[in-house]
Amino acid sequence: PRADRALYALLLTQARHKNYIALGDDSLIKTAVEYYGDKKKSVRAAKAHYYWGATYGEKGYTSFAVDEYLTAIRLMPVRDEFLAMIYDNLAECYEEDRLYNVAIENYRAAYQILKGKDEQTYPMRGIARVFLLQNEKDSALYYYQQALDCALADQDSSLIGALYHDLAMVYSEKKDYIQADKFVSKAILLQGQDAI
């Protein structure tokens, strides 16, 4: 039946996306999009549009990805981690298009949903990166430090290493080479020579 094909298409696309397998063309996820539609709020409809957007994003069609992410947000019936992920991906699209204020807005929306949870570090890091892109180094440092504090509390070593690297870059751009060296050294200790 059509419902089974739509669910299969959605779950297979979701599994590929989660495992970083290229989504290829949109024919598979389009089956789910057509079945679930874009009128009635449901998690499956939101996910179908999200993954359709991810397929577009993978191909470099940012404006189409943005449209699908916005549709997914509209269709999402609950405020949960998945909604935060949609906002986070939408923010990345806006960041790519240099729409920095809108990117920060969406990272903040993701953060508001994730506040107090382990995943809150990701939108904070996004906010910091956008501030750095705008050459607002002090704001970037503030958000990178907030993200680092969360990653340290969660003992997420891969994220801690990445944030040490991020902080080293900001301090280097500020020409504070002593602080930059301190964070590079911490990153190397944690991640080995690959950190540089």
Map each language-model feature to its residues.
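A "functional boundary" signal
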Residues: 1-196
